[in-house]
A protein has these predicted regions:
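Residues lining hydrophobic/aromatic ligand-binding pockets adjacent to catalytic sites
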Residues: 1-114
Length: 114
């Protein structure tokens, strides 16, 4: 099972491997709250700044981010982690429901055909 949640939310038994997918380490988060930090899977600085969590740009953000992911070799590492574990949780810090972890989950589910 693949899920997403805020890194600040409480740990749960079904989280499985907890993978932080943000470029920057979130404030106040201790290292033992995250199993793996894949900062290179996050959107480019250019794309992140362009999007700026503007809901009107969400669909275009996803399209551009999916293009970046299709060229990112770290996706293979992430897919291997997900396939190795029964459960995986993509962690993000944003308060916005439209964020890179949600988009990444959508992309991975297409790749995995879930």
């Amino acid at each position: 099972m693949l899920k997403v949640k805020r890194v600040y939310d409480p740990l749960e038994n079904d989280d499985g491997i907890r993978i932080l997918v943000d470029k920057l380490w979130p404030r106040g988060v201790q290292k033992d709250q995250v199993d793996v930090w894949l900062k290179d899977i996050a959107p480019s600085d250019e794309l992140r700044k362009w999007y700026n969590h503007d809901p009107n740009k969400w669909e275009e953000f996803k399209r551009k981010y999916f293009e970046e992911l299709s060229r990112n070799h770290k996706v293979e590492i992430l897919l291997q982690l997900i396939e190795k574990e029964n459960n995986a949780t993509l962690l993000f810090a944003s308060k916005s429901p439209n964020n890179n972890a949600v988009a990444l989950k959508e992309y991975l589910e297409k790749v995995l055909k879930v």
